[in-house]
Amino acid sequence: MLPFMLSSFLGASPSIWPLAPAEAFQLPPCQLINQTVSLEKEGCPKCHPVETTICSGHCITKDPVMKTRYVYQHVCTYRDLHYKTFELPDCPLGVDPTVTYPVAVSCNCGLCAMDTSDCTFESLQPNFCMNDIPFYY
């Protein structure tokens, strides 16, 4: 109905309005995606990229008319995950080359668990590597 009303108002054919405006701007839902992450460990000279799955996408948010003390927003986060182990190459003797990283199995929109997730507005990218930053003495 809305495309017809807009078409009538704007004098255009309904065929140029194939989707309702809200559907046209629909964002991807919270879901598993493949992501390259950089693994690194103190004492090892290089980062190593690995492919894993992470949770990414949008969750329904709310902005209540009457402000309450405890307003929270749902974020796209892990429902289930497991961990994989990887051995970094080129680590010197005496440094354990083993690192463990999470692999998302399923996702959901829920409260952010600050002890296991990065809930900041703009966090470091998954492929960020501290070894790539020059250190000046």
Swiss-Prot record:
Q: Which InterPro entries match?
A: Cystine-knot_cytokine, Glyco_hormone_CN, Gonadotropin_bsu, Gonadotropin_bsu_CS
- Sugar attachment sites are N34
One example GO MF annotation? hormone activity
* General function of this protein: Involved in gametogenesis and steroidogenesis.
Q: According to the lineage, what is the superkingdom?
A: Eukaryota
Which parts pass through the membrane?
none
Q: Where in the cell is it found?
A: Secreted
- The UniProt entry lists the main location of this chain as secreted
Please report the name of this protein according to its UniProt entry: Gonadotropin subunit beta-2
| Record Pfam families | Cys_knot (PF00007)
Q: Which UniProt keywords apply?
A: Disulfide bond, Glycoprotein, Hormone, Secreted, Signal
Q: Choose any GO biological process term that the UniProt entry carries and state it.
A: G protein-coupled receptor signaling pathway
Name of the coding gene: cgbb
Cellular-component GO terms for this entry: cytoplasm; extracellular space
| Subunit relationships | Heterodimer of an alpha and a beta chain.
Q: List the disulfide bonds.
A: C30-C76, C44-C91, C47-C129, C55-C107, C59-C109, C112-C119
Q: What organism is listed for this UniProt entry?
A: Acanthopagrus latus (Yellowfin seabream)
Signal peptide region: 1-24
Q: Which family does it belong to?
A: Belongs to the glycoprotein hormones subunit beta family.
